Amino acid sequence: MDTRRTLLLALCIIPLMIQFVPITNASLAQTDGNRDYWPTNEWLVSPPEDHGLNSGILNQIDTSITENNIQINSVIVVSDGYIVYEKYYHAWTQYMAHTIQSCTKSFMSALIGIAIDEGYIDNVSQRVLDFFPNYTIDNWDPRKENITIERLLTMSSGLEWHEVDIPYSDPLNDLFAMYRSSNMWQYVLNRPMEYDPGAHWSYNSGGIELLAGIIEQATGYSIVDFAKEFLFDPIGIDYFSWWYVPASGQYGCSGGLNLRPRDMARFGYLYLNGGTWNDTQVISSEWVNVSTQMYYDTGSWHHYGYTWWGVPGYTFYEATGHYEQKIYVLPEEDIVVVFTGNIPDEDWHPTDYFVMEYVINAKLEGGRLDNLLIINLSLLLVIVLPIPAIAIRRRYS
């Protein structure tokens, strides 16, 4: 093989070698925040294939929902900052606000991070009782003095709390007993201790209501006004409602937020970009990182961070709400996925499966399709390009 053919063959093989060097957008998506546009005013829509996703695989989400009559009300997939897949069911539309249930908890986590960034709160090691100096606490236990903000964020306060272990209709269910109380924060602080703080994970919506109280006590804002000024307005969430609990005159911050699905996606996209939005650091990247780490094994399939959930063996994390409200953030794939729904507790909850089986595989298969195209093109060049070289050699030989 002469020099010309060797050079041409090398030029054809090099693209193949480069193509198989593992490259990920995860670090870029979480740190630099460099985007060609920001969906503050409007999301742009683009075909999945333009962002390396296989539309045939994505469409299996719709097939599964419709053929099995799954009570999903909306699905959004955002890739590279563009909506590449969006479906609505059961008369829901993109313009309608939907209950997000306990996804509200992840918004509360973000607001705690912002309150720390803004200097209203020192850090997550601050003691909870320091924010309620005028409260008289029932069932006093010195261990209550050791409950910190971090213990509330990770649901490891040690307070005795019965929410998911007994029916919601049971008068002893603490969630609804709290909603019936004249002061939700007082109700939670009055609960007896069951474990040392940090020793045990137990699902506790009451701790999230205390986080709202901490923000209001520390900032002087109502939780709604604080969220609007420091979180919603900067990322373009201009339509929302928040459940006002009549008995206490307080806002339900463990599950009372209502948002449009596209605004849920904005929140996920903020986290995907490391807290940055259009050159503004809305939440510190440090908070995004620390709050989405997993600190507790919940005893089920999921692990738990600062109100965010994770699945062992996967790099995505999710905000989760009752009846299948979900916000998934997939840093490695540069993707956000949103679901709203009305799935009863006793039914199959399919959204984790949809993300793992369809969304991630759509990205993987889209990438494989790109590889095949490059391989085929490169092989074509290997075959075709040497021909002129051979002709040139013969002409001047």
Model-inferred region functions:
Residues 62-92, 327, 334-338:
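A short, well-structured edge-of-sheet supersecondary motif
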Residues 81, 98-124, 152, 211-215, ...:
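Active-site SXXK
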Residues 118-159, 190, 218-254, 259:
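Active-site helix/loop module of the DD-peptidase/beta-lactamase fold
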Residues 316, 321-367:
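Structured C-terminal helix/loop/strand segments within mature extracytoplasmic catalytic/sensor domains
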Residues 207-214, 255-276, 325-341:
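Active-site-proximal alpha-helical segments within enzyme catalytic domains
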